[in-house]
UniProtKB/Swiss-Prot annotation:
It comes from Staphylococcus epidermidis (strain ATCC 12228 / FDA PCI 1200). Keywords: Aminoacyl-tRNA synthetase, ATP-binding, Cytoplasm, Ligase, Magnesium, Metal-binding, Nucleotide-binding, Protein biosynthesis, RNA-binding, tRNA-binding. This is Phenylalanine--tRNA ligase beta subunit. Belongs to the phenylalanyl-tRNA synthetase beta subunit family. Type 1 subfamily. It is an enzyme of class 6 (ligase).
Length: 800
């Protein structure tokens, strides 16, 4: 937003330099990105009166002009502008003057004729060509009315000014207007804010006799208002208005269109002007567009509409795309006599979707998207009517023709001085706090220390007590917050918490295994929000997402990790191993806060060990991924159990469910081939674990055990079992019968093939026996070993 200091003084007059004002505004949270000084690099620029023009004797495209600069004698200037003419009042750079770009004006001879100065175009004095009025695009600027020769030209065109450029955050849409900015400045300097003139001399004719309004989509258009102005005269707007628009980055068109844009900048309320005689009916109907309905917009483009678009119609055909752009056949032209001024409230989400889809971003649509102040809708329409009466000679008809309800202009919020002072460390009285709010234009009521603040609709960033406290701190001054040392009841030395220590251990373990940490977005598309989710829980969707791809809170970390791996592989980084520790979100129904759960996820693809000088290479596989997970469990002193399972998105035969103390906490598996192919990935393996559940169980340390004083005994067994029997089932049987001397087990071979029946496999297991208190005897080991073998036989295993 570009804020002209000359324009701002209409509403609030502060005796401060623009630099000081910009610094004060920045300290309150609105960043002033730049200050544009139109007087910079300009010297000796005055108004000149062209007394005569004669053709240059030696050049067809040059003219010799005698120009009165308010001095004793006129000066001769050779000018090549095609629109220069006798009697004009123009901008002249005198000899010794300077123009932007380091141009110095000197006496010169042009094709043999003396020239003492330069008649200037707007571009030559620093005005961008994209905001220069079209009739001056290829020539000099000509004043529409006589100006005393010798007058400072910058003052004559209101460029003796400095303009602040605001870099606004989306929550401060109120500062997208001159009036909104004036409220802010008035509060900062505790001065009065003057509102614009609104009252017109209305005729006795009523607009209600000429126009009716019907809104069929009140959920998208809660309020639609119009006024009618007759007998307008189309022409240029006054110089001061033209140059205020230019300084705000808008090209002047004509008085009617300029007034619409002027009020937009003044109030932040988009308006639209219809040519009443071109509407084609006395009825305006607002509705949703019909699918594949078409209309031609002001830019001359034929637009195909969707049923999500809002259209303004004459009861039959669209005459405007609501909140985005008008239609071409009802636009204001030089032949326009009567205009209908429209002000409305449109649904921000609908406007954003329409403007983005059609690539029609404008000053109006951007304001509707952020939400407009209901208190300013009718004021802005009345202001436009006042300006049309004054600068377009229009006659304003009495009465407003509208549909809907503006609702409340304020949101009441209660607060106390004690709450304010405890939060920000001030020591303000009720009166001082109330004064700050009233300077901001907020009405207040104080009942026994309970201050009710009525927040106006223009301040959509204020909805809770803490927002009000922030306003007090901003306006009173962050610099005024006293410095205090923190006071602690129980002072302890800084150290890692138990959870932080465990997390550091997990990260070191994963990074030691070659995985890199990733941090991905918490928001995913609605279609992928429940991918890989173990729980069937509601999702949480944003009310106003910035894009469909980031509209819903995730229930798994894997969708974005898969995207990250796909991105790397597409750029020839084919060996990727990532992990992430982050939160996922599960809904609890309407009106309930969601559950936030921390997860640990990983993804591996390509080679785990690259080709080395030894010629060895090891690709990522299921068991390697499982080994990474088991290593985490070992570091946290946890015992994971694994069983075959199925998860949507994973290979049905290469997936294991991970459980802890009988509760499922995650899974390991290979990406389903279809999903992998869709992401241009080869075999890719993932794991996801409920990190919170792991932290609850983990003791975070490993008990010390001394080196055994007595030797252990190992026995190897080979078991022939059915193909569907898993090694974990066999190990479970072994441990159940191993008594207290079975120290460890290890599966060291699995064989399928010759010498075995079809549907059979052989699993070789090493059993380690140890007694920490006594020397093991063969009798005791044999007894326990035989017990284990008998138990295995009962479950169908054949001892080989």
């Amino acid at each position: 937003m570009l804020i002209s200091n000359e324009w701002l003084k209409d509403y609030v007059n502060v005796d401060q330099s623009v630099q000081a004002l910009a610094e004060r505004i920045t300290r309150t949270g609105i960043e002033v990105d730049d200050i544009i000084d139109y007087t910079k690099d300009i010297k000796k620029l005055v108004v000149g009166h062209v007394l005569s023009k004669t053709p240059h004797p030696n050049a067809d495209k040059l003219n010799i002009c005698q120009v009165d600069l308010g001095e004793e004698e006129p000066v001769q200037i050779v000018c090549g502008a095609p629109n220069v003419d006798e009697g004009q009042h123009v901008i002249v750079a005198k000899v010794g003057g300077r123009l932007p770009g380091g141009i110095k004006i000197k006496r010169a001879k042009l094709r043999g004729e003396r020239s003492e100065g330069m008649i200037c175009s707007l571009q030559e004095i620093g005005i961008s060509s994209h905001v220069t009025p079209k009739n001056y695009e290829s020539g000099i600027y000509v004043f529409p009315e006589a100006v005393k020769p010798g007058t400072d030209a910058l003052e004559a065109i209101y460029l003796n000014d400095q303009v602040m450029e605001f870099d606004l955050t989306p929550n401060r849409a109120d500062a997208l207007s001159m009036v909104g900015t004036a409220y802010e400045v008035a509060a900062l300097y505790q001065t009065k804010m003057n509102k614009p003139q609104l009252t017109s001399n209305e005729s006795q004719e009523s607009a209600k006799d000429e126009l009716t309004i019907e809104v069929k989509n009140e959920d998208k258009v809660p309020y639609y208002s119009t006024r009618v102005v007759h007998d307008v005269t189309i022409g240029p707007s006054p110089v001061w208005m033209q140059f205020r628009l230019i300084k705000a980055g808008i090209r002047p068109i004509n008085n009617v269109v300029d007034i619409s844009n002027y009020v937009l900048l003044e109030y932040g309320q988009p308006l639209h002007m219809f040519d009443q005689e071109q509407i084609g009916s006395q009825s305006i109907e607002v509705r949703q567009a019909k699918k594949d309905e078409t209309m031609r917009t002001l830019d001359g483009e034929e637009r195909r509409l969707l049923d999500t678009d809002i259209v303004i119609t004459n009861g039959k055909d669209p005459i405007a795309l609501g909140g985005v752009m008008g239609g071409d056949f009802s636009e204001v032209t030089e032949q326009t006599r009567h205009v209908v001024v429209e002000g409305a409230i449109f649904d921000p989400v609908s406007i954003r979707h329409t403007s983005r889809r059609l690539n029609l971003r404008s000053e109006s649509s951007s304001r509707f998207e952020k939400g407009i102040a209901t208190e300013f809708v009718d004021e802005a329409v009345d202001r436009a009517c006042y300006l049309l009466e004054r600068y377009a000679s229009g006659t304003v008809l009495k009465d407003r023709v509208s549909h809907g309800d503006l609702g409340s202009f304020v949101t009441p919020i209660e607060i106390t001085a004690d709450k304010v002072n405890r939060t920000i460390g001030f020591n303000l009285t009720d009166e001082e706090i109330i004064d700050i709010f009233e300077q901001l234009g907020f009405d207040t009521e104080n009942k026994n220390g309970e201050i009710t603040v009525n927040v106006p609709s223009r301040r959509k960033d204020i909805s809770i007590k803490e927002d009000l406290i922030e306003e007090v701190a901003r306006i009173y001054g962050y610099d005024e917050i006293p410095s205090t040392l923190p006071v602690f009841k129980d002072v302890t030395s800084g150290e890692l918490t138990d959870r932080q220590f465990k997390t550091r251990t997990v990260k070191e373990t994963l990074e030691g295994a070659g995985l890199d940490q990733a941090i991905t977005y918490s928001l995913v598309s609605k279609n992928h929000a429940t991918d890989f989710a173990l729980q069937n829980r509601p999702t949480i969707e944003l009310l106003m997402p910035m894009s469909e791809a980031h509209s819903t809170l995730r229930q798994s970390l894997l969708p974005h990790l898969i995207d990250a791996v796909s991105y790397n592989v597409a750029r020839k980084n084919t060996n990727v191993k990532l992990y992430e520790i982050g939160r996922v979100f599960f809904g609890n129904g309407e009106g309930e806060l969601p559950d936030e759960v921390e997860y640990l996820s990983g993804i591996l693809t390509g080679d785990f060990v690259n080709n080395t000088w030894q010629g060895k290479k090891e690709s990522v596989d299921f068991y390697l991924t499982k080994g990474v997970v088991e290593r985490i469990a070992e570091k946290l002193n946890l015992q994971f159990d694994f069983r075959a399972g199925q998860i949507d998105g994973l290979h049905p035969g290469r997936t294991a469910i991970v459980s802890l103390n009988g509760k499922d906490i995650g899974f390991i598996g290979e990406l389903h081939p279809t999903l992998a192919a869709n992401n241009d990935l080869k075999r890719t393996y993932v794991f996801e674990l409920n990190y919170d559940a792991m932290m609850e169980v983990s003791v975070g340390y490993i008990n010390y055990e001394p080196i055994p004083r007595f030797p252990g005994v190992t026995r190897d067994i080979a078991l022939e079992v059915n193909h569907e029997v898993t090694s974990s089932e066999l190990l479970s049987i072994i441990h159940e019968n191993g008594e207290d001397i079975l120290n460890d087990t290890l599966v060291f071979d699995v064989y399928e093939g010759e010498h075995l029946e079809k549907g059979k496999k052989s699993i070789a297991i090493r059993l380690s026996y140890l007694d920490t208190e006594n020397t093991l005897t063969d009798e005791r080991v044999n007894a326990v070993h035989d017990k284990i073998l008998e138990a295995l036989k009962k479950h169908g295993a054949i001892i080989r």
